[in-house]
Design a protein with these regions (language model features):
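Acidic (E/D-rich), amphipathic helical modules within compact regulatory domains
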Residues: 23-66
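Short glycine/threonine-rich beta-strand-turn micro-motifs
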Residues: 46, 113-114
Length: 154
């Protein structure tokens, strides 16, 4: 199976740019209902992600009392590389291992351009549909995911 099967293309993904203001980022996050959003640079390269907590800490650290105060600062100030992308040719078991720890996995092409995301929800939905029920057994997952899960339970 190819990871493109799970890909949500960039034009269907809510994302921010490094030059978006904190206010724009907060509004986009509120309107989308997401708790974390990918960020790209002006050339379309994946720059990282921002989470709700990143906004909160920046607001608290700067003492903002009005959202309009966040209009002069950009997402660049809070973007993080905690969520690392996978290349388009990444093996499915590596994708599944990454999806264990993050809500979505950013996907980049050979030029490091952001091409979309794969959500943990879509992966789980696929396995539920494939299995015909909501009971998912370890046999449905590659061995590397099973060993990653086992190490988390220690």
């Amino acid at each position: 199976m190819n990871l493109l099967f799970f890909l949500k293309p960039k034009n269907y993904v809510t994302y921010l740019t490094l030059d978006s203001t904190l206010r724009q980022g907060l509004e986009k996050m509120r309107n989308s209902g997401y708790t974390e959003i990918p960020v790209i640079d002006k050339d379309g390269l994946y720059a990282g992600t921002v989470r709700q907590g990143d906004f909160l800490w920046k607001i608290l650290d700067n003492g903002y009392t009005d959202i309009r105060e966040a209009e002069n600062e950009t997402i660049r100030a809070i973007v993080s590389r905690r969520i690392l992308p996978v290349h388009i040719d990444t093996a499915i078991d590596e994708l599944l291992t990454k999806a264990l720890d993050q809500n979505f996995v950013p996907v980049i092409d050979d030029l490091d351009s952001f091409i979309g995301i794969i959500t943990r929800r879509d992966i789980i939905k696929y396995f539920i549909e494939k299995n015909g029920s909501t009971t998912i057994t370890a046999a449905n997952f590659p061995a590397s995911v099973q060993s990653a899960k086992a190490s988390c339970n220690r």
